[in-house]
Swiss-Prot record:
Its cofactor is pyridoxal 5'-phosphate. This is 8-amino-7-oxononanoate synthase. Substrate binds at R26, H129, T345. The lineage of its organism: Bacteria, Bacillati, Actinomycetota, Actinomycetes, Mycobacteriales. Belongs to the class-II pyridoxal-phosphate-dependent aminotransferase family. BioF subfamily.
Length: 382
């Protein structure tokens, strides 16, 4: 059969139609600068993205250093601002060093690929974020996917390995369900088998611990020489970017070998300045971390979720993707924006509303959330 005259992209129409039929079509929605609706969808957990100090920090960096870094940090993109922020972040999180990337995604790619490679083993939690999954695929290491939060399975995989090096990968706070990794137990297993533990604190920073220093700090593992932390600047810190924290030797290795660092333009100065200012606010106002969990507990009660949340995330399982999409749309029609997670982001049959608590939610906003969520969820569950 000749293929002459056929569009090489004709197959996209069939794929799009199939996704639409399965309720998995995604659309971009434009957000105004000041949203008219109540936001229970964003990851701005501490409410800092619009904080005056954070805005001033971004503007000052913009005026001082310009709109962009101008190149890779190995060429022209490394400024005093970047390095000062890395010291600030490492000090706050109890790490020896930090290296800033252009996003949390590239931080995970850079760290895991550079710290594994052919002839090594990666043991990754089944619910690890897509950036960690992609890093596993790019690493050329042997990858074992362990059942969610199953320490015994991790132990068995490490005990059976023939590779000299091994990395165990987990999120501290899992992004879809908001549950916590058993970090102390995982670390004990890693120590017993001589494995590195890599922990993504994207959803732990700013929320867990009495001062918002993350789950590693909370459980007494911050700064451990056999742990590498990754995190993002785009959630609790209300900015953009990512970072890898750990021993100084890790930082030096990443500068030499992490392709998502070497071949990427440095993080924009405005994002660095905003993140630095946000970190200062969090350091001065640690009560914001507790406020997030308090508001999450209220949202869980409103949504009929019986298990008390341990993070900013309240996951409301509805099952069918069309029901979840319809519920999210109904909430938005009544002035409340919520997250909607469907496959492949979550497993089939677990489509859900994802509610994200913020420290800055007011009593009036919580009253609106109660009114809307109670009505919409009653209909969705009927």
């Amino acid at each position: 059969m000749t293929r002459a005259g056929l569009s090489p992209l004709a197959w996209l129409a069939d794929i799009e139609q199939r996704r639409r039929a399965e309720g998995l079509r995604r659309e971009l929605r434009v957000r105004p600068p000041v949203a008219a609706e109540l936001d229970l969808a964003s990851n701005d957990y501490l409410g800092l993205s619009q904080h005056p100090d954070v805005l001033d920090g971004g503007v000052e960096a913009l005026r001082t250093w310009g709109g962009g870094a101008g190149g890779s940090r190995l060429v022209t993109g490394n400024t005093e601002l970047h390095e000062a922020f890395e010291h600030q972040l490492a000090s706050f999180l109890g790490a020896e060093s930090a290296l800033v990337f252009s996003s949390g995604y590239t931080a995970n790619l850079g760290a895991l690929v550079a710290l594994s490679g052919p002839g090594s083993l990666i043991v990754s939690d089944a619910l690890s974020h897509a950036s960690l999954v992609d890093a596993c695929r790019l690493s050329r290491a042997r990858v074992v996917v362990s059942p969610h939060r199953d320490v015994d399975a991790v132990d068995a995989a490490l005990a059976a390995r023939t590779e000299e090096r091994a990395v165990v990968v987990t999120e501290s706070v899992f992004s879809a369900d908001g549950d916590l990794a058993p970090l102390r137990d995982l670390h004990a297993v890693c120590r017993r088998h001589g494995a590195l533990l890599l922990v993504d604190e994207a959803h732990g920073l700013g929320v867990r611990g009495t001062r918002g220093q993350g789950l590693l700090h909370e459980v007494g593992l911050a700064g451990a020489p056999d742990i590498v932390m990754t995190t993002t600047l785009s959630k609790a810190l209300g900015s953009q970017g990512g970072a890898v924290l750990g021993p100084e030797a890790v930082r030096a290795h990443l500068i030499d070998t992490a392709r998502s660092f070497i071949f990427d333009t440095g993080l924009a100065p405005a994002a660095v300045g905003a993140a630095s200012a946000a970190l200062r606010v969090l350091d001065a106002e640690p009560q914001r971390a507790r406020a997030v969990l308090d508001r999450a507990a209220e949202l869980a009660t409103i949504a009929g979720v019986t298990e008390a949340p341990v993070s900013a995330v309240v996951s409301v399982i509805l099952g069918d993707p069309e029901i979840a999409v319809g519920a999210a749309a109904a909430c938005l029609d009544r002035g409340v924006r919520v997250g909607c997670f469907r496959p492949p982001t979550v497993p089939a049959g677990t489509s859900r509303l994802r509610l994200a608590a913020r420290a800055s939610l007011t009593d009036d906003e919580m009253a609106l959330a109660r009114q809307v969520l109670t009505d919409v969820l009653a209909t969705a569950r009927a």
